């Protein structure tokens, strides 16, 4: 099969002469001592070394790695020395920790930090019991969400405080794949997230979350631990290598720094294969890494993180982190905490990167932009994001669980009054602190300031389908066929409270029949409440967004929200192309197709556009 290498083109004269600002490298296992670092230097695989334990590191081993780093202008990150599941150092470091820290402190000038609490989301939230050491998890049994949240905060703070007391060099870096764990870590003492990029449907969700959380907590960068060798598939054929190459450039496009190989520099030990340094496959792994490192060295990326216009809010007391998680807040032995509709709602983030079919009646406008969100990416942001950072987003969407409180409520009202748009459901105005607690309306159901509605004590199930009666003022376009049309979403049936309307405009109503002379007002299902310069689009459902009865309607609303954001640049392309936009106006375009070229149109303004051709696997940087 013909080999299609990743091509890269920089459309800016002279830029390749600048020094790269993105570090590339690999993971260095202790059993090879300095050999991996030396290989990275000798074969031009980058300048970044992440020390990893296969047996303990000792001071003499560290000095050998440091010598290679200094001789070759390289940096390194220290492996974890503290137990992930218990307070204190790993037993293997009990006798040598003081000497190790002395070596690290003397060489802090070429250190990029220390690994702390690796795989935190897996250990505490997501792994099945059989995967955790000795069949146990770190997270204790709890009965409420707030107990779990407090334990997580304390766990991170205790570990980082202890690391400080030992004198371990900062920044403290946590590596892991669970998208929902990043905010928990950054909130309580971790300085940087390096995403363990496990491949599958959550790839973009991880990037959305790490970028959003990093921005929210004032972190300048995040890294990517490229775990393609473990999680990219077991058959290393040509399509596998195309995925491998694409994963490097995709990390670059999304703003990662550093970017490094989890394995494959010195050996390959994954699944059923055990390959040594000189095995042809391992040699090829290194070549692909070297090609990427060489390109990055010639092509600096804009400073900062990619822009986003739309954010999904990770709510208060949301104990879902993704990946293999089966129970909220890591309560694997308590079936009351099993994940459900709130958690399944996060699938919508992944669908923001899926193009709607040519035969979809939902797509509106003059140009087809579905398949990539506005500005090429969405962010997932924590509920405690500062107001000034929240204001950077044009639209904020609630998906998973949220326990509303006064501080968040006031922040949302202020955000909307200054021009923001929120999409949410009554479910997100819950205050329940336990899976056993029924929906408990925030502020006794008086949501008039935010939504224009006041929830009453009664509950009822939406009986009919949906007819849209009006478009909101924020630019979203709904299907409006008048009164004589078939109802939409007739497989609905979500639960909602009885309520009073105190100033919200109705956008959709329930309908059971096609032929009606006027819209029924018996069952109003969607509202817009204007506050100052912005508005809240509100569905009164107390059923979770991810429940079968609400998911189709809510996904439709999310897609109309993405479609309605008017921000430039806009890129007209298939979902085989991924793109990002930076603050200086730079646009990065990546063709992820293996053997198919693409032509895209970059709309830089309403009157200025240009066509760009992308070869298979090509990355272009347009300034």
Positions of predicted regions on the chain:
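Mature N-terminal, pre-catalytic/accessory segment of carbohydrate-active enzymes
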Residues: 15-82, 95-120, 131-143, 306-307, ...
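Aromatic-lined carbohydrate-recognition surfaces of secreted/lumenal glycan-active proteins
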Residues: 22-29, 77-85, 113-119, 148-181, ...
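Helical hinge/lid and interdomain linker segments adjacent to catalytic or ligand-binding clefts
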Residues: 33-42, 46, 50-72, 344-441, ...
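Substrate-binding cleft/loops of secretory-pathway carbohydrate-active enzymes
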Residues: 103-104, 161-209, 231-239, 439, ...
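Active-site clefts of carbohydrate-active enzymes
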Residues: 190, 209-241, 265-278
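Aromatic-Pro/Gly-enriched surface loop or interdomain linker
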Residues: 287-392, 529, 616
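Carbohydrate-binding surface patches
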Residues: 305-341, 391, 402, 413, ...
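A glycine-rich, often tryptophan-bearing local segment used as a flexible ligand/cofactor-contacting loop or short
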Residues: 402-492
């Amino acid at each position: 099969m013909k080999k299609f290498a990743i091509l890269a083109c920089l459309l800016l004269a002279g830029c390749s002469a600048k020094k790269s600002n993105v570090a590339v490298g690999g993971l260095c296992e202790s059993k090879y001592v300095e050999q991996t670092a030396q290989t990275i230097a000798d074969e031009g695989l980058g300048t970044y070394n992440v020390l990893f334990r296969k047996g303990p590191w000792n001071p003499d081993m560290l000095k050998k790695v440091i010598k290679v780093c200094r001789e070759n202008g390289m940096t390194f990150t220290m492996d974890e020395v503290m137990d992930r599941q218990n307070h204190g150092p790993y037993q293997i470091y009990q006798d040598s920790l003081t000497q190790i820290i002395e070596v690290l402190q003397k060489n802090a000038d070429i250190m990029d930090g220390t690994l702390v609490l690796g795989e935190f989301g897996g250990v505490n939230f997501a792994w099945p019991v059989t995967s955790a050491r000795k069949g146990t998890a770190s997270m204790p049994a709890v009965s409420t969400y707030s107990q779990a949240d407090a334990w997580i905060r304390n766990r991170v703070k205790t570990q980082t405080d202890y690391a400080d007391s030992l004198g371990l060099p900062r920044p403290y870096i946590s590596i892991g794949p669970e998208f929902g764990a990043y905010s928990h870590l950054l909130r309580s003492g971790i300085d940087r997230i390096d995403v363990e990029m496990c491949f599958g449907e959550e790839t973009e969700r991880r990037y959305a979350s790490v970028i959003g959380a990093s921005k929210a907590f004032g972190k300048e960068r995040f890294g990517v631990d490229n775990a393609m060798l473990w999680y990219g598939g077991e058959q290393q054929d040509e399509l596998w290598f195309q995925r491998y190459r694409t994963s490097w450039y995709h990390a670059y496009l999304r703003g990662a720094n550093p970017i490094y190989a989890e394995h494959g520099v010195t050996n390959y030990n994954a699944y059923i294969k055990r390959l040594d340094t000189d095995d042809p496959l391992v040699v090829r792994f290194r070549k692909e890494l070297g090609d990427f490192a060489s390109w990055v060295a010639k092509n600096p990326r804009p400073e900062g993180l990619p822009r986003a216009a739309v954010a999904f809010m990770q709510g208060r007391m949301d104990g879902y982190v993704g990946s293999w998680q089966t129970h909220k807040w890591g309560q694997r032995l308590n079936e009351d905490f099993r994940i459900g509709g709130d958690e399944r709602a996060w699938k919508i983030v992944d669908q923001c990167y899926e193009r709607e079919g040519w035969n979809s009646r939902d797509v509106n406008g003059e140009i087809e932009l579905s398949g990539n969100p506005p500005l090429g990416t969405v962010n997932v942001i924590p509920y405690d994001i500062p107001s000034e950072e929240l204001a950077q987003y044009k639209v904020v969407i609630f998906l998973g669980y949220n326990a509303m409180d006064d501080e968040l409520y006031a922040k949302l009202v202020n955000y909307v009054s200054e021009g923001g748009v929120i999409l949410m459901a009554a479910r997100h105005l819950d205050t329940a602190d336990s899976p056993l607690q029924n929906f408990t309306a925030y502020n006794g159901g008086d949501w008039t300031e935010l939504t224009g509605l006041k929830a009453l004590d009664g509950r009822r199930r939406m009986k009919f389908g949906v007819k849209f009666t009006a478009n909101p003022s924020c630019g979203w376009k709904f299907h409006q066929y008048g009164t004589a049309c078939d109802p939409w979403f007739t497989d609905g049936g979500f639960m909602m409270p009885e309520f009073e309307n105190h100033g919200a405009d109705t956008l959709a109503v329930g309908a059971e029949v096609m032929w009606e002379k006027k819209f029924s007002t018996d069952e109003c299902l969607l509202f817009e409440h204007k506050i100052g310069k912005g508005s809240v689009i509100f569905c009164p459902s107390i059923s979770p967004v991810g429940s079968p009865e609400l998911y189709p309607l809510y996904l439709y609303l999310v897609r109309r929200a993405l479609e309605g954001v008017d921000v430039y640049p806009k890129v007209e392309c298939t979902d085989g192309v991924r793109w990002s936009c930076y603050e200086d106006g730079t646009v990065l375009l990546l063709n992820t197709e293996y053997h198919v070229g693409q032509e895209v149109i970059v709309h830089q303004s309403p009157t200025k556009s240009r066509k760009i051709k992308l070869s298979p696997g090509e990355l272009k940087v347009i300034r």
